[in-house]
Amino acid sequence: VKIGKALGTEVTVLSTSEQKRKDAERLGAFDFALTSQPETFIRLQRRFDFILDTVSAPHNYNDYVNLLKTDGTMILVGVPDKPTLLEPFPLILHRRRIAGSVIGGIRETQEMLDFCAIHHIESDIEVIPIQQVNEAYERVIKGDVRFRFVIDLGSLR
C-alpha cells in the first residue's frame, strides 16, 4: 500500500477480513473491499489496471481476473498449496495477463530499498524477544499476525 501510494496510484486493499480495514486506511489505501462478500466482485468488475495477489490460501483466480480492466495484469506472489482452474476466455477477450514472481534479484531489491528510503517508507513489524518465538509461531499458524515478526536478538542475553 505504501509503495503504491508513493508511486501515485490509487491502491485498493482486497481482504477477507473487516479487521484489516483500519490498517488499510492508516497505510493510505484509497479503498477497501471485502472479498468475503460476493457483491464486491460485481462492484469492482473491470476496475483495476494491476492486481498484486499475495494470498497463499487457495482462492478463485477467476474472480480476481474479472476485476482487471482490458490489458490489465495480475501478478501472483502467494503460493496456494492446491492447483486452481483458470477460465481462458476472460483473459483472451480482454487481453489480460497473469504472471508470477518469487523475489527480485539484488539490483531490484536495491532499487526498492532506495525508493523506500527516498519516500520514507518503513516496514510495519512486530518486534518480539527470542523467548516468545514459540508463541509467535502459534500465532502464525492461527492467522493471528498483522505484520512480520522480527526477533530482537538482544533478548538472547
Where are these regions (language model features)?
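Rossmann-fold dehydrogenase core element
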Residues: 73-75, 86-126
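Helix-to-beta-strand junctions that scaffold the AdoMet/dcAdoMet cofactor pocket
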Residues: 68-70
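C-terminal hydrophobic helical "lid"/dimerization subdomain
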Residues: 6, 62, 106-157
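Well-formed, non-transmembrane alpha-helical positions, independent of function
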Residues: 23, 63-66, 90-91, 115, ...
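Conserved SAM-binding loop of SAM-dependent methyltransferases across substrates and taxa
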Residues: 2
